[in-house]
Structure formats: C-alpha cells, structure tokens
Amino acid sequence: MSRYRGPRVKIIRRLGALPGLTNKTFKSKSGYINQSTSNKKVSQYRIRLEEKQKLRFHYGLTERQLLKYVRIARKAKGSTGQVLLQLLEMRLDNIIFRLGMAPTIPGARQLVNHQHILINNNTVDIPSYNCKPKDIITIKDRQKSQSIITKNLNFFQKQKIPNHLTFDLIQFKGLINQIVDRECIYLKINELLVVEYYSRQV
C-alpha cells in the first residue's frame, strides 16, 4: 500500500487530530460524532485498525514500512509498543518536525529529500534515517535552506519542544539529548492495540 496523498481533513475527521499529518483541526457540527458508528457496537478489530491507521497517517508511513517497524520492535528488549513508538519518533523526518523546522512530517520529509538537512555535518537525504542521542542536526549554509526553515521556525516553534531535543535558534542547530520517553510522545495513541492488530502478521 502506498503512502496516502489524499485529502488530509478527511483523515482527521475519521481518526482525530494527527499533528504529524496536518496542523488543521476538524470541528464537528451540531455534536456530529461519526454517525456511522455512534449507534453501533464497534468491533475490537475496527478499534485496533483505527489505532494502527492513526500511527500510519501521523508518521506518513506505508503499510509495509509500519509492519517492518513492528517486526523490529518485537525483536527488541522491552515493551513492543513503546519500542515501536521510539523507533518512529527517532526517524529523521519526525525529529525535524518535532524541532519545529517543518510544519508537518510530510513537510519535514521534503526538506530531507531536497538535501537541506545535515546530521553531524554530513548531508542526509533519507527521511527514515534513524537518529541517535548526541546527533547534531543543522541546515545547509545556503540562502534557500535558511529561508524555508526560518519561516517554519518563526511560526511553529511556539509549540513546546520535547525534553529529548534541544534547538539553538541562534546557530540553527538541533541536538538529540536522549531516546524519547513515552511521556514526550503527544500523539493520542494506544500502541498496545497496534501491536495486537499486527499479532498474526509478525
């Protein structure tokens, strides 16, 4: 399954706020809340499916990519669900987003693909790159790169940067202090249900 490129409002209407996908919010009219299911008993399968979809759309992943991360998380020590979230949070495109350098994860992915981003002074153009503690993230010293990111920073750094990250507004430099804690992941998600959804596939 390919990455979703359709209307984003349609997704957040169904799944709720997904800040990685879009900074838009959906306000229901006259107390409208998913009328197709409000009077029906929702199956456990559907509940798990929707949690999985939240994760996939928020981080902008294909089905194959998400399944790959679930398999890696299952082999790691610790809670599979929390390890899964840590793997996704430490992707380069997500780190750029959480630092406030891009409005959304798709926007961050575009910055990486267009080679605006440096990690430890080396150009990295792979959005899925797995960042590590002590990695230093900067931008290329060219006018276009700085102009794009300055515009984003001025608007989006009003949001609080999570504790595992630091950003120097003077030097345009981000630092990864540590692996993200569960408390710093602001997406409303039940990761256990995602793991349960994939239990038969991994």
Swiss-Prot record:
Entry GO CC: chloroplast; small ribosomal subunit
The cellular location(s) given in this protein's UniProt record come to:
Plastid, Chloroplast
The answer, when asked if Iron is one of the entry's keywords, is: no
Q: What is its main location?
A: plastid
List, alphabetically, the SUPFAM superfamilies matched.
Alpha-L RNA-binding motif
Gene3D superfamilies for this protein: Ribosomal Protein S4 Delta 41, Chain A, domain 1, RNA-binding S4 domain
GO molecular function per UniProt: rRNA binding; structural constituent of ribosome
Transcription among the record's keywords?
Answer: no
Q: Which UniProt keywords apply?
A: Chloroplast, Plastid, Ribonucleoprotein, Ribosomal protein, RNA-binding, rRNA-binding
Q: State what this protein does.
A: One of the primary rRNA binding proteins, it binds directly to 16S rRNA where it nucleates assembly of the body of the 30S subunit. With S5 and S12 plays an important role in translational accuracy.
Share what the entry says about its subunit structure, partners included: Part of the 30S ribosomal subunit. Contacts protein S5. The interaction surface between S4 and S5 is involved in control of translational fidelity.
The text of the family note is:
Belongs to the universal ribosomal protein uS4 family.
Q: What is this protein called?
A: Small ribosomal subunit protein uS4c
Tell me which species this is from: Plagiochasma rupestre
Q: Which gene does this sequence derive from?
A: rps4
